[in-house]
């Protein structure tokens, strides 16, 4: 075998069935169809999508029936544009949900100044994407470390998801973020589809 399936688990995001940013893409696909097809394809884990039940017990039951579990959940942070008190409160609520469904990873993407959902705004040209200054980098990395520490104290790994149209999009921005955060608390969710 290519890998030991007792130690390596393959998960998938539901974006191939329904798109959270553009719900009309895959709008006809139900939650039940999505997770059933994931399981039939051999995946044992998945991220949470917009059609998933919001009740942890209902979600866990549906996945248990298919031999699956939640691998992670996307969390939109706003470290640069709201207070850390608000950020921590929302982050902890997401950890509570993930804990209830048996997950131990959370994928974080900084959405302050994001243009990812603006289909009429170019991401790579025209200077539309926000570029952080040194002060913003400091605030961002300290905030990310704080969220990572909270996650770690609860047995979670915070995995940062670089994303097109956000303040951490390029390889240089990703390198700077990783170099200025604590490796005990901040991990990388490497996305080849979004790396520029």
Predicted regions and their residues:
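Active-site acidic/histidine proton-transfer and metal-coordination neighborhood
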Residues: 84-188
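N-terminal pre-domain/capping segments
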Residues: 1-105, 134-135, 141-145, 183, ...
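Short, well-ordered alpha-helical microsegments
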Residues: 55-57, 174-175, 196
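Active-site-proximal loop/turn and secondary-structure-junction residues that shape catalytic pockets
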Residues: 16-18, 50-52, 76-79, 110-114, ...
